Each structure stands twice: as C-alpha cells, then as structure tokens.
C-alpha cells in the first residue's frame, strides 16, 4: 500500500510540474503576496496582498491544490493602482489531521499574468486539552480525582466529545478506561480508586482527542508518610576553585510555618573524590543553622573536568521525636570565576553601518564587576579595542564595518589577558571570555532598514509598544518622492496586525536615511511571542527588510482572584473561600496540604505552563519536498559582472529578505528581488547550500506532497524566562486529616463572584489553594496559589501503642506545644473512664507554665481494664490566672484556648484467638421447624474472652454480599488469593441482577471491588501474558497454567461489568494455547501451592478429558473423587450430557448421605486434633469438589431437571454448613467455586415470598429474640449478641420460604502443648536482658518444619504478632524475600506475615528485627501462628517474650 501511495505522489508531483508556474510580467507592476506557512481549518486566516504600479484591473486568485483536488480560497478584483490589503478566508475541515498542499496565487489581467505556488501545511483546528489531578502523589487504596479541561487556541472552553481516556500503570497496563467523555463548559471531573496493593511508581492519565492526538498527565503511587516539616538548604550556585570555605545554611520549618527544634548534620561530598566532610550543629530559635565549612581538603587543582560539583546533604532531626528529613543541594566548582555576557550583539550586521556591542562582566555569584578592563577583537576586520566596565559591570563597543565585504563577523571579548592554564588539564582559576558571530544582511545596493529592540524585558498586555525603525537607502532612487514601509505582526503562526508608514523624500537627498516610530498594540492573542516584519520596495524592485521578536507577557483575559476570609484559621473552624472571575465562569477549585507538595513537588498551573502545552505550541513547517516552490534559474557569472559592474559574489550565508520572510513562518509570492542571486559558472551552480537544489529535485520528486506526513515539524524553543464568630472557648477535637481538602466546581454569578463556606480540616499545616476558571467570553483564567494556615496557638500530641494485651501497662504521653510569643498557664487532663486506670507521673497535671515557643510533656501510667476498643481523650486548656509565669504575666489566646485529641487503643485478651461458626438453612412451609444448639468452651479458655452472636438472613448469599472484600480470615497476598477478592463480585452481580435484587449501592460497591481486584491481579502478570502466584519476580518464576486459565475466565466474565483491557485476555489465551500438547492436554507450568488441585485434568480439551475418564473408570480409585467432580462440570459446560450423566452416576455411588444432605469426602484426610470440641470445617478441596458437583447438576441442558435441583439442594445444605462468619469458606479457590455454585442455585430456585418468615432464638434461661424475614429485608443481615456462653439455645422457624441462620462463637484460649502438623520454634536474640540493646531492639528467630501426613505442606503462612509497643524493622522483614522459600512478606499494624511456598521435614530458619516504639510495662508474650493456607486445621502455635520482659524497672 505504501509503495502504491508513493507512486501516486510521484505521478501527482510530475503533473503539477506542468501546471503554469512562470511569471509573465508587464512594465513596472510589482506583486508581493504573503501567507502563513501553516493554515488552520475552520479558523479565519489572512493572506496579505501588496500590488502597486498596476496599469489595469486584475483578479487575484488563491487556491489550494492537493491529491483530493483544488479548493478556491478567494477571488479578489483589484482596480486600484496600488494596494496593500489582507483578505480573510476559511478552509473547511480535512479528512486527516493535516496535509501538505500547494498554495497557488494567480494574478491575471488583460496584459498581466502571474502565477506562483508554494507548499503549505494545512492542519485541522486542534483543541487544547490538559488534565489536573487533585494531588501529585497517592497512597495505595486512595481515590485519584482529576479533571479534564478542553479549550480552543484562544483558551475559550469547548463542549468537546473526547473519544477515549484511560489510566496506565507503570507496566503500561490499562487499568481503567472511559469512552465518549463530554466536557461541559470545558470541564469534566472524574475519579478512580486505586487498589489496596497496586503496582507502585509513575502512572499516566491519557486522553485522546478526536484527531487522535494524545494528552498525558502523570502522577505517582507510593507508600509514604507526609513530612511534618520541610528542610530548606541554601548553598551558593558556584564557587571558585580557589575558595577554601563553603557557606551552608539549613532551616527546618513545620508546614504551618514555625521553626523546628533539633539538630542538623551537614555532609559535603566531592563528586569525583572519595570521602566527605561532615559538620553537626544545633538549630537556633528560628530553626536555622549557618555553617562556614572548610573545604580545602576536598578541593582539587588537577582534574580533567571544566566544572565539578560538591553534593551537599543536610539531615534535620526533630527534638523529642527523632524524626528525620533531608535537604539536598549542589555547588559548582568553577575555574572560570568571572563571566562575560553579551547583552547587545545582533545576530546580523549591515555593511557600512557600525555594529554595536554591549557586554556585562559578572562574578561567580552573578554580581556585576566594575572598573575592570575588557578587551574586544574582530579578527577579520583587524579591529581591537579595550574599555573599562562601569559601575554596572557594562562595557560598550562600536565596530566600524565600512569597507568590510565579508559575510560573517567573528567577535571575541576577554577579561584581563591570556590564561596560564589551558584546556581541561588543571583546575586553576581562568579568565572570562565570550564569543559572538554575526552574519551579513544582503543588499546589493547597501540599503538597509533596522528595527531597534530597546528592551529585552517581557512586554505587558493591553499596552502600546513603540518600535523605532532606522533606514538608509543608497543606489539609484530616481525621482523617488515618498517611501512606504509596510509591516506585519505574527503570533501563533497567524497574521495579527498590519500597517504602513510613509516617509517623504526630499529632492536630491542621497543617501536617503532617517528613522520613525511604530506603535504596536500588545494584544492577548500575541502571547507568548510575536514577530514583526517590516519591508519597503525600492524603485528598481529590490526589497529591504528587517524583523524583530517580542516576548509577550503570558497573560490571560479571565482575571481570577482567590481568597480566604482570613489567612489563618483554627482547625475545625468555619472559613469562606471567595472566587472572583468573569461573570458566569465555571471554576475548578483545589486545596492541598503543603506536606503533599513537599513530598512530591509538581508543576504549578500558571500562564507559562498553559502556553507551553503541546496544543499551544506553534511548530515550524519544513516542507517534505524540494518542490515546495518553483525552480529558479541561476545567473551566469559573466552576466552578473556585466549587469552589476562588480565581481563580488554573494557567499550564501548572508540573510536576504526571503529568509526574513521564512523566519516569520510566511510564504512569499512575488516578482520582486527578495533572494540572494544564484551565480553559475559554466552553467553549473555554485557550491553551497542552494547549489544542491537540482540534485535534491531528482532524488525527491516522488515525495512532493504528503497527506498526513510523518515528518512532523519540531516545536519552537519557548522563550526563557469572614464567617460568623465562634465561641473562642469552643473545644477543638481533631480527627479529620485529608491530604486534599477542596476539590470542587463552582459557577461564578453575574457579578463575577462565588463564595463557598467550608470547614477547615484538623491538620495543623498550610493549605495551598488555587482556582482555574473558564468563561465563554474571556476564556481561561488562573488564580495565584493562596495559602491558608490551619493553626492554633497551642496543641497537644498524644502517643500510645497500637494495641496492648490485658494486664499490661503503658506510659501515655501528651506533649503540649506553645507557638505564641508569650507564656501561658496550662492544665492538661486525661478524661476518666471505667475502661482503664491512669496514674499521673509527676505533679504538673493541675497547672504548669509553658514558655513562649516551648513544649511540655505530661505522662500517665495507664492499665486497661476492658477488652476491645478503648478511647483516650486528652484535653489541654489555657487558664486565666493571676499567678505569673516567671517574670511574665500568663496570657490567654483569644481563640483556640482548648484542644482535645481522642485516640483509640485496642485491648486484646491474652492467648490464641479461636472462632467457630454454626450454619443452618431452614426452609419452612407453614409448619414450624426447630434446631437445638449448644455453645461450649474448652477448659483452657481465657477468662472473659468468649463472645457470640446470632445472625439471620433471608438470602443464601446475604453474608457473602455484605463481606465480599473480607470473605476469609486470612491474608490475600498472592495472585491466586487475590481472585477471591475479584471473582465473587461477578457472581453476586449476576445473581442479584437475575433475581431483580440489585440496588445501586450494592452495584457501586461491587464494581469498585472488581476494579480494585483487576488492578491487583495485574501485579502477578508476566511479560508473556501468563500469571503466577507471586508474579515473575524478575523472571525467576514461570507462569502457572491453572491460575492463567482462572484469570482468563474471570476477566472475560468481568467485561460485562467493568473495563478490562482486551489485550490481557488475548495475551493469556495466546500463552495457554502455546501450552497445549498434541493430545489436547495442557503442559503443567509454574508453581501452584495447593497440592490437592495439581491434577492434570485442568485441561478443558475434550480429547484429553475423554482419555482421562477412561483411565479413571478402569481404575475405580477413590482418589479420583475431586477429578470426577471437576470432569462432570467440564463435560456439562461442553454440552456432553451423556458423559456428564455417566460421571454423576459414578459419583452418586461414593456419596455420603446424612442429616438430609449429600456430600463427598476425599480419602486420606490429614488427621484432626483430638481436642476439637466441634466438628471441624471441611477442607478447601472438599468444599471445592462438592461445589463442582452442584455446578455440574445445574449446567444440565436445556435446564436442570427436578431431580437435579433436589440433589443440588441436598449438597447445598452441606455446603452452607461449611461457611465461615463472613460468608466465605476454608480458603480461596473453594470460596470462589462454592459461591459460584450458591449463586447459580439461588438464581434457579429464587422466588418471591408470599408470607413472612419468623425466626426465634431462645436460651434455656430468659433470653429470647425474634426476627422477621420478608421480601423487603431479604438481603439484610439481622444480628443479636448471645448472652449465655456456655449455654443451650433453640432456633425455630415458621412461615414460608428459606432463611439462613448463623451463630458465631469467638474466644481466646491459653497456649497448651499439643500434637500439630508443624514443628515450630521461636526464640529471641539476645535471649536475656544482659545486652543493653535487649530493652529496645532484638531479633526474632523462627525454625519451621512439616511433621504432617503428606510429603510436604501447601503454601504456609507464618503470622508473627508483635509484642505490645513494638514494631518490626521493615527492611529486615523485606530482606527475607531474598530467601528461596519465602515469596512474600507483609507488615500490618500489629503483625508480620511471611508466605512460604511449602514446608517439608527439612527445617527452615529465618529471622528479623523488632524495635520498641512505646514502652509497655508487664509485657505479655506474643503468639506466632504457622498454618497451611489450604488445610487450616494443620496449624502450630508458639509464643515469645521480650528478653527484658521480666525487668521490673519503671517505664
């Protein structure tokens, strides 16, 4: 196809070459037509016509010619003798984003004919789109909020339909997608929730425009703790190689602006030298420290580098907490310690006119150096000079170019003289020098015009800028009476302004010279850069010109102001945010905690940022073909000499008018002299840039015009550059700490004002607020960033452990900080509670003085008395008192005189947690049915730890629906386990939809869980499209066949509900296909840590299944129960009813029928503990195979028979008894398959209740509770605590319909030695308290081996609970993942979880470190639990204590 297109282009180019392109001129008529080199569709564009000395009426025609034909732009009849006028036209939309086309300009009259073409780029009008997020960095599990903004190039809002937007994770997985997003008044707000364990790193929001152009915005996902304070490090940008001291200033400031007390460590390192210099100091009262660091030993004088660096690091450690934050900086070591900067030196010079140079001499800090000699040399001219810098470091020179005929001027300026140190060998100080090259402006007559750019500053909008023009005209001017200068101003690739100036020529004046001023209005449309071209035409047809660029203020028409009612507010107080903008503007507001921006700085929304957006950039058009303009013949050298009477020949580097026009991004159609003449010798063109044209023509003729060319132009370098008063004694209880406070859209009223009342969050910080507003009249406006300090004169911080064990005691500490400049008398109080006892430590609780900018800590020795969550409320209040504080009178602040902090502590019982669940499915039909239940406790139960509750549900899936993200009391840390967070939501949605019970609330919740599970599962994807339990782990693991098939199936089902990138399904399917053998079976690949489902019949290939069934049928081995169940379901899915029936019949012979239920058990079960009071829950594989039997019966074709439903119900009765308290089962895969079976059974048998069901539970004592179940509350989980444990209860059900009853019993039991499937040994290092380190930090060492009935366990979880007040040292835990047998580690609030692939009889040993966070007294032992993930009855317990747990010293 490409070759065909190239051939068409080639033929088209050849045909175009035969179209009229020569000029036929009459008399002195002159033509100059200027048009932008890039034209935009659906936008008014201008072509400027300049015709004069016409002696007849002519018609000017402009048209575009492309492969699709010719489009006429305009026909203009010109009757005037002289004309300078711009004509507007509009080009219709293209079918492609852009096209290179030929623009033809034809001028025809009775005796005139002029035709010329040039290549231009026609582009469809493009919108400007960008994305703003509510913050730059997110934690796992947080919601990413963002808004899409759409505008045209004038920055006015668009109601644009954007076809596609998506979020891409660091592995380029598309994790969320939206289609057909419609912006309203230029704005669309959207959000997306991150998974609890997403891939961490840089994410992208990608938005596609209708043209196919993509706009991207990045954000970061990472685990972080917001910095409490900022470290500001100041070092010089550069120092001399001879400097011996480096001044370093470090300041620590809290986010609310107050100084940080503490220490600072400064480290200075040379980038190429070993070793560093360190200095320690204390921060002063302002939170700062300035140090003069001797760096002599770090300096080097012999290095092969022009510039080297010092890397400076400052670590500030907060007093009291030990928190550390860093600041970084670099300082250059330069041997050129002074610099010469050209302030004025044009890029081009004019022969015969002085060339002015102005330079500034500055030192290494950028400060001007006065009274120093500066030398200048222009070697080609033989010009040398010297002068002394003035008080501003300036030196000025004027270079005479009279008699100079060269094409370039090389200028060098020096400070002092020659260097004693050359090249890069040494690091001694060198003297400053600078060079500049200027090229000649071409004019055969030596006539010139020159525009003076008086200032290098940025031009402000809405003002008049005066441009001064100087000119000198030589040569034969004849009887010229007046001279007209024409000018154009361009911005963003379009002609913005035009005008002219007439100069009267005095008779006999020669040469003609003078100057004049042009007043240019600076408009919004000219930003960020405007270009001005001025030219005039001499009588002989020569054109002289000049141009100048202006940097324009990046201004916005819509003036937006944002303000808070006060710049400082108390936490939890009311404030008002006011926005002023153009009337009816739509404004997006944002306010972010400054701590977030300290953690991850971002580019601030500003006019500069807007004008640098890709959609605002004007790209220079470079034609893809050498046929972009008509060929021109060269002039023979002999003719040149005869005509011009000179043997001087242009060199080719001079700047002619053609290049001035080209630099303006204009195309010129003219019969005037605007180009350097091309001189030929012996009919051959001169060598040089333009001499290559003929060769280029022959080699590139096939590429004349390109539609949607891939050779895109490069962007130009951007220019350098009050609420009602509150009771001041109102108490502040701080509990709301968002990272983004304001993220909202408001509409400004007709007077241009919008006000929003809001509550200040409880975070003591500085909030950074901003607004962007869009108006149909004035476009986009941005406010400056407005701070609000959420601050109170004093506040209290409370520290306590995450949890303690009953019987332990800990020190609760409350630190009060005073940030007023005066002293206060304070009282601090811990609110009394029956849940704990608190003994004050010290005598300062009633009243004490707190000095200005001081802090004070009060302590209580606390012993909890109740189990569960215990609240601690600490209040501090400034008191009115006549008693002085030292020599000062104690003051009381007007507002914020009391601060209260409430924190929660978990108090746990000692021992091992146990849970038992008793489930019953009652299906009543008028007659009452009942069941007795006994709750008993073991003799080793921990006192007061037992609790139980009874639940009633009207739907078989009620419990699972309520707990879809917490179905198991187990971790979910691998790819297979994550699917239990994903797949059940599909079954729930399908079931509720089919039974017409799906509410919007449940749907929203389930869709959120599906999206989170989808994100998490992508963590475990391999590059080849497969999946494994722990991902590829840098290529060390291969994909797992079973898990890949499961993910493929689940993703395919989830497509009906959420976005799933189709590539993930395609890649998984392709990988699975590659694993299939010739016989239809699949190669078993990768590790699956559930040994009981590692049978080869995972294949869905029927030929493989047929062969497997024959083997099983012949063997009659009971080991194949699981296999039969799975095969029955597989044949049912494949539609092979005969095979399904045959296998189900075989299974019926092995079924266990008891208690009105039917189920199947596997042989060779692991032995059960003799100490079990209750029948244990069925194993994972047994639940799974029974669920497969139900699924096989329900997948009958065309529908399940009454017998299928009856038998399924009997198995469902057994399955429901295996559910845990959250609606899940034993493990992950059994939960997924069983919930699938329950949902399908429920959907098939669902019917609306005709009568209410009445459920009653009563004890042998006085307790009795009734529940009603009806259609309106079928999904409601009704619950009541049970008072008598131990105790006997009776459950009775009457009415009509099925109800699901569940009793959950929980208690703790003391650890006792018993037979288990694992040998577990735990000890601490050091073992005793002899080592002082044992108080605060020690190592936990574990040894594990498998002693069960199988050769090896399944995947094993080691759950290590932390001692109260201790936390794990995370790096030492993470390091365990390097061990071969540990695939993953997790650190939660109070536990460390270790995932072991499997455990054999070979002992595995590993250890990590824990350290004390808060001191706890009477420290109780902590439990370590090791269990088989899929055989949860295989479990072992051990306990450990602190080496110093028996230490009786005070805490």
UniProtKB/Swiss-Prot annotation:
Cellular compartment(s): Secreted
Segments of this protein annotated with the region Disordered: 703-728
Positions glycosylated per UniProt: 55, 294, 313, 500, 749, 776, 871, 1401
Phylogenetic lineage: Eukaryota, Metazoa, Chordata, Craniata, Vertebrata
Organism per entry: Mus musculus (Mouse)
Tissue specificity field: Plasma.
UniProt-annotated stretches for the region Bait region: 677-734
Signal peptide: 1-27
Principal location listed in the UniProt entry: secreted
Cysteine pairings via disulfide bonds: 48-86, 251-276, 269-288, 461-555, 587-773, 634-680, 849-885, 923-1274, 1081-1104, 1298-1444
InterPro entries: A-macroglobulin_rcpt-bd, A-macroglobulin_rcpt-bd_sf, A2M/Complement_sys, A2M_N_BRD, A2M_TED, Alpha-macroglob_thiol-ester_cl, Alpha-macroglobulin_TED, Ig-like_fold
Assembly and binders: Monomer.
Keyword Ribonucleoprotein recorded: no
The family this protein is said to belong to: Belongs to the protease inhibitor I39 (alpha-2-macroglobulin) family.
Full protein name: Murinoglobulin-2
SUPFAM superfamilies the record matches: Alpha-macroglobulin receptor domain (SSF49410), E set domains (SSF81296), Terpenoid cyclases/Protein prenyltransferases (SSF48239)
Gene Ontology cellular-component terms listed: extracellular space
Keywords: Bait region, Disulfide bond, Glycoprotein, Protease inhibitor, Secreted, Serine protease inhibitor, Signal, Thioester bond
This protein's record includes keyword Coiled coil: no
Biased composition (Basic and acidic residues): 713-728
Cross-link annotation Isoglutamyl cysteine thioester (Cys-Gln), location: 974-977
């Amino acid at each position: 196809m490409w070759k065909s297109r190239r051939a068409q282009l080639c033929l088209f180019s050849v045909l175009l070459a035969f179209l009229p392109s020569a000029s036929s001129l009459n008399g002195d008529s002159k033509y100059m037509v200027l048009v932008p080199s890039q034209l935009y569709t659906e936008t008014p564009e201008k072509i400027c016509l300049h015709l004069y000395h016409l002696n007849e009426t002519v018609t000017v025609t402009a048209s575009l010619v492309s492969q699709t034909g010719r489009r006429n732009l305009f026909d203009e009849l010109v009757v005037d003798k002289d004309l300078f006028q711009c004509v507007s036209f509009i080009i219709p939309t293209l079918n492609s984003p852009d096209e290179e086309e030929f623009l033809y300009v034809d001028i025809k009259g009775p005796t005139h004919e002029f035709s010329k073409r040039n290549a231009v780029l026609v582009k469809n009008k493009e919108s400007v789109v960008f994305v703003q997020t509510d913050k730059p960095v997110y934690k796992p599990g947080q919601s990413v909020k963002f808004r899409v903004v759409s505008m045209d190039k004038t920055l006015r809002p668009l109601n644009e339909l954007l076809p596609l937007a998506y979020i891409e994770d660091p592995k380029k997985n598309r994790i969320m997608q939206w289609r057909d997003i419609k912006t309203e008044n230029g704005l669309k707000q959207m959000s997306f929730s991150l998974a609890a364990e997403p891939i961490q790193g840089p994410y992208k929001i990608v938005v596609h425009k209708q043209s196919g152009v993509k706009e991207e915005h990045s954000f970061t996902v990472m685990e972080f703790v917001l910095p409490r304070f900022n470290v500001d490090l100041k070092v010089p940008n550069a120092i001399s190689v001879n400097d011996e001291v480096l001044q370093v200033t470090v300041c620590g400031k809290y986010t609310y602006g107050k100084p940080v007390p503490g220490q600072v460590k400064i480290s200075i390192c040379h980038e190429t030298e070993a070793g560093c210099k360190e200095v320690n100091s204390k921060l002063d009262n302002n939170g700062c420290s300035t140090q003069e660091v001797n760096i002599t030993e770090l300096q080097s004088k012999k290095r092969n580098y022009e510039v080297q660096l010092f890397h400076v690091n400052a670590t500030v450690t907060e007093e009291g907490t030990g928190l550390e934050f860093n600041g970084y900086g670099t300082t250059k070591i330069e041997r050129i310690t002074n610099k010469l900067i050209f302030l004025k030196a044009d890029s081009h010079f004019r022969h015969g006119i002085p060339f002015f140079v102005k330079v500034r001499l500055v030192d290494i800090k950028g400060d001007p150096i006065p009274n120093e000699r500066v030398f200048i040399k222009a070697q080609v001219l033989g010009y040398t000079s010297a002068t002394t810098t003035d008080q501003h470091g300036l030196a000025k020179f004027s270079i005479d170019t009279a008699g100079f005929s060269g094409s370039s001027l090389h200028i060098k300026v020096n400070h002092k003289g020659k260097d004693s140190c050359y090249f890069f060998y040494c690091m001694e100080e060198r003297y400053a020098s600078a060079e500049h090259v200027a090229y000649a402006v071409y004019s055969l007559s030596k006539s010139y015009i020159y525009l003076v750019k008086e200032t290098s500053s940025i031009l402000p909008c809405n003002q008049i800028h005066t441009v001064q023009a100087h000119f000198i005209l030589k040569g034969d001017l004849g009887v010229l009476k007046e001279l007209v200068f024409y000018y154009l101003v361009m911005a963003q690739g379009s002609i913005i302004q035009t005008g002219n100036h007439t100069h009267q020529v005095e008779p006999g004046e020669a040469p003609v010279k003078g100057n004049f001023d042009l007043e240019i209005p600076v408009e919004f449309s000219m930003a960020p850069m405007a270009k001005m071209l001025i030219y005039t035409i001499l009588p002989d047809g020569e054109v002289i010109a000049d141009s100048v660029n202006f940097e324009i203020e990046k201004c916005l028409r819509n003036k937006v102001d944002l303000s808070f009612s006060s710049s400082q507010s108390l936490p939890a107080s009311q404030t008002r945010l006011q926005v002023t903008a153009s009337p009816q503007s739509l404004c997006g507001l944002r306010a972010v905690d400054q701590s977030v921006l300290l953690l991850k700085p971002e580019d601030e929304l500003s006019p500069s940022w807007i004008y640098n957006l890709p959609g605002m950039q004007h790209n220079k058009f470079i034609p893809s073909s050498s046929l972009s303009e008509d060929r021109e013949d060269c002039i023979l050298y002999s003719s040149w000499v005869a005509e011009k009477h000179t043997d001087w020949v242009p060199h080719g580097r001079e700047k002619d008018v053609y290049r001035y026009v080209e630099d303006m991004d204009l195309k010129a159609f003219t019969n005037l002299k605007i180009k350097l003449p091309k001189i030929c010798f012996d009919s051959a063109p001169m060598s040089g840039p333009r001499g290559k044209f003929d060769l280029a023509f022959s080699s590139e003729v096939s590429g004349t015009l390109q539609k949607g060319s891939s050779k895109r132009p490069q962007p130009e370098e951007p220019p350098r550059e009050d609420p009602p008063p509150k009771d001041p004694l109102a108490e502040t209880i701080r509990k709301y700490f968002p990272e983004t406070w304001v993220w909202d859209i408001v509409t400004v009223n007709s007077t241009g004002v919008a006000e929003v009342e809001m509550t200040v969050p409880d975070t003591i910080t500085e909030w950074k607020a901003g607004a962007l507003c869009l108006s149909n009249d004035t476009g986009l406006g941005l406010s400056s960033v407005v701070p609000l300090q959420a601050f109170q004169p004093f506040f209290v911080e409370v520290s306590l452990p995450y949890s303690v064990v009953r019987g332990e005691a800990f020190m609760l500490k409350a630190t009060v900080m005073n940030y007023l400049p005066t002293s206060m008398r304070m009282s601090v109080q811990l609110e009394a509670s029956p849940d704990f006892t608190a003994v004050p430590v010290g005598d300062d609780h009633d009243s004490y003085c707190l000095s200005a900018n001081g802090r004070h800590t009060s302590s209580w020795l606390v012993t909890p008395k109740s189990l569960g969550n215990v609240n601690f409320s600490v209040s501090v209040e400034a008191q009115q008192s006549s008693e002085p504080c030292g020599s000062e009178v104690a003051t009381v602040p007007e507002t914020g005189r009391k601060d209260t902090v409430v924190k929660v502590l978990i108090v746990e019982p000692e021992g091992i947690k146990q849970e038992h669940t008793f489930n019953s499915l009652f299906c009543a039909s008028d007659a009452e049915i009942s069941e007795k239940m006994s709750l008993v406790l073991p003799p080793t139960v921990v006192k007061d730890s037992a609790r139980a509750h009874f639940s009633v549900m009207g739907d078989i899936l009620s419990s699972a629906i309520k707990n879809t993200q917490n179905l198991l009391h187990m971790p979910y840390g691998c790819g297979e386990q994550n699917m239990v967070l994903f797949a059940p939501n599909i079954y729930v949605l399908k079931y509720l939809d089919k039974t017409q019970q799906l509410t919007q609330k449940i749907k929203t919740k389930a869709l959120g869980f599906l999206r989170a599970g989808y994100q998490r599962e992508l963590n475990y994807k391999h590059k080849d499209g497969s999946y494994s339990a722990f991902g590829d782990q840098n290529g060390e693991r291969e994909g797992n066949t079973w898990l890949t098939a499961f993910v493929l199936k689940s993703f395919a089902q989830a497509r009906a509900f959420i976005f799933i990138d189709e590539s993930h399904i395609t890649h998984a399917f392709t990988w699975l296909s590659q694993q299939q053998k010739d016989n239809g079976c699949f190669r078993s690949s990768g590790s699956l840590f559930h040994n009981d489902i590692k049978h080869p019949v995972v294949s869905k290939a029927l030929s493989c299944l047929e062969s497997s069934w024959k083997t099983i049928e012949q063997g009659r081995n009971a080991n194949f129960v699981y296999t039969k169940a799975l095969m029955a379901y597989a044949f049912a899915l494949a539609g092979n009813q005969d095979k399904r029936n045959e296998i189900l019949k075989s299974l019926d012979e092995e079924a266990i029928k008891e208690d009105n239920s039917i189920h199947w058990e596997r042989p060779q079960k692991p032995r059960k503990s003799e100490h079990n009071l209750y029948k244990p829950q069925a194993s994972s594989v047994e639940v799974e195979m029974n669920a497969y039997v139900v699924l096989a019966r329900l997948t009958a074709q065309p529908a399940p028979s009454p017998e299928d439903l009856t038998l399924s119900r009997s198995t469902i009765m057994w399955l429901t008894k295996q559910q845990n308290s959250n609606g899940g089962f034993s493990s992950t895969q059994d939960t997924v398959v069983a919930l699938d079976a329950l949902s399908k059974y429920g959907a098939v048998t669902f019917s609306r209740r005709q009568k209410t069901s009445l459920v009653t539970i009563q004890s042998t004592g006085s307790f009795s509770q009734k529940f009603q179940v009806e259609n309106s509350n079928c999904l409601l989980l009704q619950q009541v605590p049970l008072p008598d444990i131990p105790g006997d209860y009776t459950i009775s059900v009457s009415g009509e319909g099925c109800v699901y009853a569940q009793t959950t019993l929980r208690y703790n039991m003391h650890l006792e030695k018993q037979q288990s499937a694992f040998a577990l040994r735990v000890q601490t290092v050091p073992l005793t308290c002899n080592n002082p380190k044992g108080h605060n930090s020690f190592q936990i060492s574990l040894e594990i081996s498998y002693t069960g009935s199988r050769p090896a366990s399944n995947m094993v979880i080691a759950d290590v609970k932390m001692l109260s007040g201790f936390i794990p040292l995370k790096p030492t835990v993470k390091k365990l993942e390097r061990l071969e047998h540990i695939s993953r580690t997790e650190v939660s609030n109070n536990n460390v979880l270790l995932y072991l692939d499997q455990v054999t009889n070979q002992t595995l040993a590993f250890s990590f470190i824990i350290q004390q966070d808060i001191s706890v007294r009477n420290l109780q032992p902590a439990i370590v639990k090791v269990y088989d993930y899929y055989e949860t009855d295989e479990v072992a317990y051990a306990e450990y204590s602190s080496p110093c747990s028996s230490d009786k010293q005070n805490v």
